[in-house]
Amino acid sequence: MGQTTIKSTALDFTAIKNNLKVFLSQQDEFTDYNFEASGLSSVLDVLAYNTHYNGLIANFALNESYLGTAQLRSSLVSLAEGIGYIPDSMNASQGIINLSLNLESLANRPTVVTLASGVKFDTVVDGTSYVFQTQEEISARDNGSGSYSFTTADNVADIKIFEGTSTTKTFNITAQTENAAYIIPDEKIDIDTAIVRSFETPSSTAFTTFTDLRKATSLTSTSTVYILKETPKGEYEITFGNKTVLGRSPVAGNKVTVEYLSVSGETANGAKVFTPQNTVTVNSQNFTLQVSTVSNSFGGSDKETIESIRTCLLYTSPSPRDQCL
């Protein structure tokens, strides 16, 4: 009795072709055929290549479905989503500085000078220019002689500045769809710097601030939280709750803004000198901020590597707020 099956799981092209020859030669319809002839040999080549490629695709697909064998970042990102683990994004490099202002020559000096978030500083690392900026409001009080030393809202004199470009992505919600995802086409987001706000209408000034799910301490049907995570394509998407799971979401007619830093990662580490981009205007006069570096820039990093994701997934419990320890 002739062979009725072909072993197509082998990935070796020659072995597949030989299996085809054996199979066909045992069929009554092909008993007198010369399978080494150029015509039949070419047909067998096509069949063998097709089987070979299908076998490779099947093996690749299976390998990419498992944590231990996946090789593509997109596969590991998808596996991470299944247990609620959010791979780390790029991280902004940060420096620490002291800021002061000398208004000794100014008449009618104000008691307090306040600077909004986003004060920018230029620096150079290994010949490449970077921009760092504050991420919170800072203020300084006259010491009685016209010298102002800036502190944070917590009265801390060491002020953190972060590398990156301030970016805002706006979404006008036209329809409320369950589990809707909004794409942010930027692979350089530092998700820790994101600020998410929802406005009642596109022209509203009042807003509700949503909290990163990783930082939420409790969840109810009315919680305002968001999830900002990497997609298999490498960009990012933001999702909200559905009034039952993970709280509520923006509704049709709302406007959602996502402010974040688009960063350079590790290459911005090591900056030593920070020069203010702009002067400070007080009583219609311009003054230059005085900067003292407390710490060279540090902490910038690229996206979490696939091997780190793999290791973290092995030791992370299935909770959206968990991160690798």
Features from the language model and the residues they span:
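Signature of Asx- and small-polar-rich beta-strand/turn repeats characteristic
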Residues: 1-317, 321, 325
